[in-house]
Amino acid sequence: MSERYSGPLVVEGKLADAERLKQESHYLRGTIAEDLNDGLTGGFNGDNFLLIRFHGMYQQDDRDIRAERAEQKLEPRHAMMLRCRLPGGVMTPQQWLGIDKFAGENTLYGSIRITNRQTFQFHGILKSDLKSAHQLLHELGLDALATANDVNRNVLCTSNPVESELHSQAYEWAKRISEHLLPRTRAYAEIWLDQEKVAATDEEPILGPTYLPRKFKTTVVIPPQNDVDLHANDMNFVAIADNGRLVGFNVLVGGGLSIAHGDKATYPRTASELGYISVDHTLAIAEAVVTTQRDWGNRTNRKNAKTKYTLERVGIDTFRQEVERRAGVTFEPVRPYEFTGRGDRIGWVKGIDKKWHLTLFIENGRILDYPGRPLKTGMAEIAKIHKGDFRLTANQNLIVAGVASRDKASIEALARQYALMDDSVTEQRKNSMACVSLPTCPLAMAEAERFLPQFVTEVEAIMRNHGVGDEHIVLRVTGCPNGCGRALLAEIGLVGKAIGRYNLHLGGNREGTRIPRMYRENITEAEILREIDALVGRWAAERQPDEGFGDFAIRAGIVRPVLDPAVDFYD
């Protein structure tokens, strides 16, 4: 990383308007409750449009019919996307049945969307149904607090069903970190759960009265799997085990992928190592990292407000020293660890606890009854008989976890009956991913989720033609440069530029530790496929044994590696 660290600890200047909004929100209340009772519009007005994000929702509309409604002098068809807080992605079959029923009866699209942040989203909830959605989550033992905006978002944890004891310990820490960093305001309970207002003054001892400068993402990672893509996250705890038991964490900070087209002051960044800590220091270090970013993060320019820019401004050594001072903990040298991959192991695996775990490939994470593929009904049928739990993965798949040997056949029979298991799915498709994008995401510049399935079919044909049809390239599509599809950690990454046009990035690796460089800018699908055809042909003919596509692209000089993204990402 860059060694040019000479910036101020605190950026002075006129604060971004989001800071005013938070300051005036009365600890995230705003006038959301009043807006809920306004039947003249299906949306939220003014500051509430942004404040609801702290409560786990985004106001969206169906962009496919936006122009048509405008011609009819109608407002956009406003509906909310609601995202659950589900640290580690673990939920019970009973919780699944509850959300399945709600999605079918109370959303415009009838689907459950598993996200690459290990939770689920409802798309298309009308304003009149929002309170019942939050109350349903509460009844199920869930909530949507702090799954969006300037807070610590849903905490990820490696979906490792084989190392059952280690996973259990890591998962417990993911939950504890999530709970420790939650907002303390009672606004969520008052507005959505109709709990009484209390006279006590709100305080936010960790997040502060204006919360964080920007969104903040955290992971707990169990090597050698990097399924959570730690380098896309602000704060990461890499599990270090001794004889199968968790003893501590290597802490890495400052990863992030969001950029803005045309703004070279924005760039992706991999996370930097702070050092090793024993498990008993985990919450103290987590809090210290968050409060340091709270106080030092840029509140004048939201495009430069994330932790990665704070590190580039003040330097990793200065940041580390401040975290140590606040936590009263001194980092030890980083313990050895390595990553070998980040894909999910689709199909059955047996854990050391003798339980079986079935990972189901869910293309794009969209659980819906498709013609001939009634996935949503199938998941509900499995939930009715499953005695273990469900684990949502950061690759948008679902694990039916903790299956006893005697129950394995009945679970598999249902999975096959409802097309949740398909032996014909290629390795390439399993290693391809897209964000939601159009028609619901207001930031989308190009298609992603709707684009990916057929695009992968074209890539599969190219792979077969070059004799590598049984192999895979980590392929990701994100509909805009905000990076939700994590394309800037892929071997082939497409970043939406306009309808039908993408920037093509090459040179990431399978382990997710290298940022790909832009190879072609603003090109069409046909142009992308021509480029991929030529490049896969070279890879198939010239690669070294076991050399991944991204590694080949670097070695062959097709693209130069991104070594210091603050300086060379745009070179």
UniProtKB/Swiss-Prot annotation:
<dbReference type="InterPro" id="IPR006066">
    <property type="entry name" value="NO2/SO3_Rdtase_FeS/sirohaem_BS"/>
</dbReference>
<dbReference type="GO" id="GO:0050661">
    <property type="term" value="F:NADP binding"/>
</dbReference>
<dbReference type="GO" id="GO:0009337">
    <property type="term" value="C:sulfite reductase complex (NADPH)"/>
</dbReference>
<dbReference type="InterPro" id="IPR005117">
    <property type="entry name" value="NiRdtase/SiRdtase_haem-b_fer"/>
</dbReference>
<dbReference type="GO" id="GO:0004783">
    <property type="term" value="F:sulfite reductase (NADPH) activity"/>
</dbReference>
<feature type="binding site">
    <location>
        <position position="480"/>
    </location>
    <ligand>
        <name>[4Fe-4S] cluster</name>
    </ligand>
</feature>
<feature type="binding site">
    <location>
        <position position="441"/>
    </location>
    <ligand>
        <name>[4Fe-4S] cluster</name>
    </ligand>
</feature>
<feature type="binding site">
    <location>
        <position position="484"/>
    </location>
    <ligand>
        <name>[4Fe-4S] cluster</name>
    </ligand>
</feature>
<keyword id="KW-0198">Cysteine biosynthesis</keyword>
<feature type="binding site" description="axial binding residue">
    <location>
        <position position="484"/>
    </location>
    <ligand>
        <name>siroheme</name>
    </ligand>
</feature>
<keyword id="KW-0479">Metal-binding</keyword>
<comment type="similarity">
    <text>Belongs to the nitrite and sulfite reductase 4Fe-4S domain family.</text>
</comment>
<protein>
    <recommendedName>
        <fullName>Sulfite reductase [NADPH] hemoprotein beta-component</fullName>
        <ecNumber>1.8.1.2</ecNumber>
    </recommendedName>
</protein>
<keyword id="KW-0408">Iron</keyword>
<dbReference type="GO" id="GO:0020037">
    <property type="term" value="F:heme binding"/>
</dbReference>
<dbReference type="Pfam" id="PF03460">
    <property type="entry name" value="NIR_SIR_ferr"/>
</dbReference>
<dbReference type="GO" id="GO:0070814">
    <property type="term" value="P:hydrogen sulfide biosynthetic process"/>
</dbReference>
<dbReference type="InterPro" id="IPR006067">
    <property type="entry name" value="NO2/SO3_Rdtase_4Fe4S_dom"/>
</dbReference>
<dbReference type="GO" id="GO:0050311">
    <property type="term" value="F:sulfite reductase (ferredoxin) activity"/>
</dbReference>
<comment type="subunit">
    <text>Alpha(8)-beta(8). The alpha component is a flavoprotein, the beta component is a hemoprotein.</text>
</comment>
<dbReference type="GO" id="GO:0000103">
    <property type="term" value="P:sulfate assimilation"/>
</dbReference>
<feature type="binding site">
    <location>
        <position position="435"/>
    </location>
    <ligand>
        <name>[4Fe-4S] cluster</name>
    </ligand>
</feature>
<dbReference type="GO" id="GO:0046872">
    <property type="term" value="F:metal ion binding"/>
</dbReference>
<keyword id="KW-0411">Iron-sulfur</keyword>
<dbReference type="InterPro" id="IPR011786">
    <property type="entry name" value="CysI"/>
</dbReference>
<comment type="pathway">
    <text>Sulfur metabolism; hydrogen sulfide biosynthesis; hydrogen sulfide from sulfite (NADPH route): step 1/1.</text>
</comment>
<dbReference type="GO" id="GO:0019344">
    <property type="term" value="P:cysteine biosynthetic process"/>
</dbReference>
<keyword id="KW-0521">NADP</keyword>
<keyword id="KW-0349">Heme</keyword>
<comment type="function">
    <text>Component of the sulfite reductase complex that catalyzes the 6-electron reduction of sulfite to sulfide. This is one of several activities required for the biosynthesis of L-cysteine from sulfate.</text>
</comment>
<dbReference type="GO" id="GO:0051539">
    <property type="term" value="F:4 iron, 4 sulfur cluster binding"/>
</dbReference>
<dbReference type="InterPro" id="IPR045854">
    <property type="entry name" value="NO2/SO3_Rdtase_4Fe4S_sf"/>
</dbReference>
<keyword id="KW-0560">Oxidoreductase</keyword>
<dbReference type="Pfam" id="PF01077">
    <property type="entry name" value="NIR_SIR"/>
</dbReference>
<keyword id="KW-0028">Amino-acid biosynthesis</keyword>
<dbReference type="InterPro" id="IPR036136">
    <property type="entry name" value="Nit/Sulf_reduc_fer-like_dom_sf"/>
</dbReference>
<dbReference type="InterPro" id="IPR045169">
    <property type="entry name" value="NO2/SO3_Rdtase_4Fe4S_prot"/>
</dbReference>
<keyword id="KW-0004">4Fe-4S</keyword>
